[in-house]
């Protein structure tokens, strides 16, 4: 399980309720989370912090999540940072769309609504897979 020392996160989510609930629950776990409502805020946050994982909505008001993910992966030091996509759109249940997200650089693709505890379990799995054996 990630410790609070290695689990700083950025969540890019335009749904205020989901974003704030996630931040509140993670802070109770001792995890530092920076929230961003759109792509511009995400890039600013990523220039100010070095998260171990990024949670990203696919449908953002100013940019498509896949495009933002590609942009993030080009930032210095972010090539290997895991990105977990979340989306409420049934469009992204199609394997071809999910594959496109993975090609954009995602480590995981999850449907919304999703319970924060379920999302935390997925984050733990991604973090475990990155640790050397």
Where are these regions (language model features)?
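Non-catalytic signal-transmission and effector/linker regions of two-component phosphorelay proteins
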Residues: 1-10, 117-133
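Conserved acidic carboxylate
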Residues: 13
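Two-component/phosphorelay signaling modules centered on CheY-like receiver
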Residues: 16-34
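Acidic, metal-coordinating helix/loop segments flanking the phosphotransfer/catalytic sites
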Residues: 35-53
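Acidic catalytic/metal-coordinating carboxylates
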Residues: 38-41, 64-70
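Active-site residues of response regulator receiver
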Residues: 57, 87
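Alpha4 helix (beta4-alpha4-beta5 surface) of REC/receiver domains from two-component response regulators
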Residues: 67, 90-108, 121
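A Lys-centered signature of the CheY-like receiver
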Residues: 112
């Amino acid at each position: 399980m990630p410790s609070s020392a290695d689990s700083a996160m950025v969540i890019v989510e335009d749904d205020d309720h989901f974003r704030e609930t996630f931040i509140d629950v993670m802070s109770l776990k001792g995890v530092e989370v920076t929230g961003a409502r759109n792509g511009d805020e995400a890039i600013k946050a990523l220039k100010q912090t070095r998260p171990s994982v990024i949670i990203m909505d696919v449908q953002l008001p100013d940019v498509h999540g896949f495009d933002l993910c590609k942009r993030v992966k080009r930032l210095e030091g972010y090539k290997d940072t895991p990105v977990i996509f979340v989306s409420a759109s049934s469009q992204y249940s199609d394997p071809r769309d999910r594959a496109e997200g993975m090609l954009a650089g995602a480590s995981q693709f999850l449907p919304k609504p999703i319970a924060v505890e379920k999302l935390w379990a997925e984050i733990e799995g991604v973090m475990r897979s990155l640790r050397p054996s």
